[in-house]
Amino acid sequence: MPRSALYGRRFHITGSIVEDANIATVAEVTRAREFVKALVLDLLAKGATFVIPVDAEKNRADGQPICFDWLVWDTIHGNLARRPADAPGPLVIAVKHHKNEGQIPTEYRSVWDAMRVSPLVQIESAAHWNMASKRMEVQAQHGDVLIAVGGGEGVLFLANLYHDAGKPVIPLNFGLGPATTGASRLFDFGMSGSNAQR
């Protein structure tokens, strides 16, 4: 069976939801999270690899996680058997800051403890940078493809880094924030006028 074109490509899934549940409804957040999980499972089965930050898991007032990072970590950890035996490594490049160890959510501590000692994970420290933009630069250096889900200025910053390096940026069209920023803005830009390839 021929290998997928995704085999060995390193994917970086990034984004967030807004605090306002009237903008990012529970139903839309659930739909986005289910999509991200299914996407990670599919990529994993096709031999793809990942860049994932190690950070806190902040929740909205209604309990919805604001970011997708720990969903990606947990999905990979729970489905390692789906990965082709001959897939290239490392499976994950984990980008962390010296403060992050203490910020790992209790419910994902066992996931991190197992993954951080695995030969499937390469840890890249951004400990010398306190600025989020510098940590994003480290992430972008390792990724091949950026997939954006919601988000805001951070998503736009990462998208520029990937674009400037000639790497694909794939914005997903979920209603997780204002249309004027993040993946929604990128999606609208890509679909408008001469930017769209139909």
Predicted feature descriptions by range:
Residues 3-10, 15-198:
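Acidic/glycine-enriched connector segments
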